[in-house]
Structures are given as C-alpha cells and as structure tokens.
C-alpha cells in the first residue's frame, strides 16, 4: 500500500488541538523553523526497524490514545519532536544545529534515551526525569508524603527508587510498644 506523511507543522497543530502535544512548542519555534525540521526528517529510517523494534516503539513510546489504539505520530515524528523539545530553550544561534544532530543520533539509534523522555517529553506531561530517588523518614507524615511523591512520579512515567533506610527495622517498637513493626 501507499501512504502519505503529514507535514510536521500540520501534525503539531493537530496534536496540540487534540491535547496530546504540548502547545508550548509553538512558542519556542517559528513556523519557518518547524518547516525546516520537516526537511530533516528521514522517513526511510522507519523502514529499518525490525518487527519487534517497531512494535516496541508503537506500544511504548508513540503518542497515542491507548483506549482506542489511535496513534498520532510516526517514529520519525517522535524523534524530531523529542529533539526539538529538548533544545527549545537553547540559544537561537545554536539550537537548530543541535536539534538536527540530536535527531540524527537518536533516529539512527546511535544513542538511547530513557523511556520517560521518549514517551512524554513532547506531551503536556513534559516528563524529563527518568529515575527519581524518594527518601522517607521514620514518621507517618514522611511516609505518607513519600507515598504521594511516588504516585505523582509514576503517573508522569518516572522510574522510582525508594530510600527506606531511615525507617525502623522489623520488630521495632512503635509508639512505645503500642504497635510492633
């Protein structure tokens, strides 16, 4: 079969309207710059995936409506949007060359990027952190606060590590022996 790709600017506008891309990208780049990105996208790189690799990209990283299965971008769109988002606040003088170099590196799989960046950096979630270490002290407010932090980070696709080293050990007394841990 044949298919036609949606030009990047049109794709961005549609995905912002649908609420799946962060609208801030349009504040960072001009339409001319976004059209330039479109000329850099190498669609043939999508054809170099193995079946398993493409399934993983589609299932885990492409922006989509997981309830309907509707996918809103191609792998190359994803890579370009990641590069554009990561370098959006760099100086105008250098950022375009950084976007191109980074796009080329990630779209050719020369470097790997963490799941939260691949899955969420161009979305309204804008998750940049890959792994987060959550500390907890040996008090109920600290334990509950840590639980809340864990829930919020997991909802934003971050990996979690928990430092529970300051929580008392098993068989320790709680409230003077009222409860045993």
Q: Can you say where each PLM-predicted feature lies in the sequence?
A:
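Extended catalytic cores of very large enzyme megasubunits
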Residues: 1-181
